[in-house]
Amino acid sequence: MENKIEPTYTCKIYLAGDIDIIKQECRKYCLTIGLCITINPTLFIYTGGEEFGVEIGLINYPRFPDTSDSIKSKAIILAQRCRDVACQHSYLIVDPQDTIYNSNRTYNIKVGE
């Protein structure tokens, strides 16, 4: 029996859209680069509505260790691909250091300012 230990790093993508379409794009990307991810359905509740979507998880898997920068780069690429196929305008990536909000909208208005 073998135990492998690597530094912990987790990165999550949050994206609205059809989970089946997003899962298929994740399969394509994972097959292309050799990657293992998790996908969980989620519900976003926001001012004025709600929308179903996904939480996609990436980790530093000790069987195939990687750097945090590389994992984050893969998350950004995957998020962009999933956003496009799901016909969405934005995604969110959360890791221990940063939260990245990416939108292809030409407007972003915060109510109350």
Each model region followed by its residue ranges:
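Short secondary-structure junctions
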Residues: 30-37, 84-89
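Short, low-order "capping/linker" segments at domain edges
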Residues: 51-55, 100-113
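Short glycine-/aliphatic-rich beta-strand segments at the starts of folded cytosolic domains
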Residues: 7-16, 55
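A generic structural motif
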Residues: 15-19, 62-65
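Short, compact, well-ordered microdomains
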Residues: 65-108
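N-terminal intrinsically disordered, cationic/polar leader segments
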Residues: 2-6, 17-19, 24-33
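Short, intrinsically disordered low-complexity segments
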Residues: 35-72
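A structural detector for beta-sheet-dominated domains
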Residues: 14-16, 40, 59, 94-95
